[in-house]
Amino acid sequence: MRSILITVLILITILVCPVYGEEEYIDSNIVITDLYSDMDSGDVTISSQNDYQELILEIKLSKDGNILQTKNIDIDQIRAGSAVMKAFSWDVVATEDGGYTASASIYDNDHKLASRNYNFVHGRPAISSIKIDSVSSDSAGMSIMISPHPGVPAIIDLNFMLVDGNDVIYTKSIENVPIHTATTTVHEEWDRILEANKDYEARVKIDIHSPIQRTVSYLKPFKATEKVVITDVFKDRRGSSITLEGESQVPFEGYVRFTVLEPWYDPERTVKIVEQESPLLLSGDDETIEAIWDEPLEAGTYRLIIEAVGNGGAVIDTKETIIEVEERRVQPTPPEDENDRSIPGFAGVYALIALMSVILIRSKKN
């Protein structure tokens, strides 16, 4: 009975926990230091002690010895003492529950330099101490919202990745994140400049340490776009100013358009249009943009439309407000006093006469 129980426990452990394959050291100067995969995607980390060029990374997905899919990824160059990461996605439609194997091999022409296997189980629910509530990504970064299961605190490691094609162009690891009583949101901002209108993938790999060691990953594609926000609007009869804040790793190369309408309720009655170029802005940058009207506005109520226009001409953000200009009050001129019409400098003449009198009196006494 005891041997049967031990056998059952071993089988449960095999089904729940991924089995990490052994490194095959064919060329000790280049190794696959890490390999991860599930039924959707995976990643490979390669470290090298020598310079290599034009290598092929071959990745296979198999079940019970039957190869389901093969991916080939070019490695144009890897420098001595460096590491590269490659990401991949599977598009296997029909999948059965059970164990699968992902294998990665590096080839220089037909010569295999290194290989590694990774075994995982698909379709079998595993015990987990966390719940992923939401995952989002955009041109600024990636966010993940994580909740603990009641009464089951956990410590996790997060590895964020920014993927361009098969190339992992940015990665950031955050270790020992506690998940205990409340929902935890973790946000990572990209530290790379992105190309406008290009497709990227955001990946996060989560290592859960308890109650059972396991790894899960989430993938969120996005299209890189410019994004800025208009804040701190000031306006009066002479002009307007705003603060423009960058919220994307795609450089904002546009301008700000100030449009004044009068009367304010008629969108066809444009009074003034001023366009001011903006400096390049990325996430976290801000700049003050000012517009001065060619002539001060007359008394009245105006609508002010402020638009941040991107490099392609699309309006990215808009703010509307009202400018109220009151009639300028003319200060009345005070009436002149009779004494003010006296001969200019007459008070000075009196002072001069008094001074001369004092001098004459002193002269006579002497």
What is the role of each PLM region?
Residues 48-55, 149-156, 247-255, 299:
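A short beta-turn/strand-edge loop motif at beta-sheet boundaries
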Residues 1-26, 44, 144, 334-366:
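Secretory targeting signatures
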Residues 178-341:
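Membrane-proximal extracellular "stem/stalk" segments
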Residues 38-44, 138-144, 236-242:
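Structural beta-strand segments of beta-rich domains
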Residues 55, 98-102, 156, 198-202, ...:
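Exposed beta-strand face motif in extracellular beta-rich ectodomains
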Residues 59-63, 104-106, 158-164, 206, ...:
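Conserved aromatic beta-strand anchor motif in extracellular beta-sandwich/beta-rich domains
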Residues 62-73, 155, 162-174, 263-277:
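Short beta-strand and strand-turn-strand segments in soluble, beta-rich domains
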Residues 21-37, 119-137, 221-234:
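Short, compositionally biased P/S/T/A/G/V-rich stretches that sit at domain boundaries
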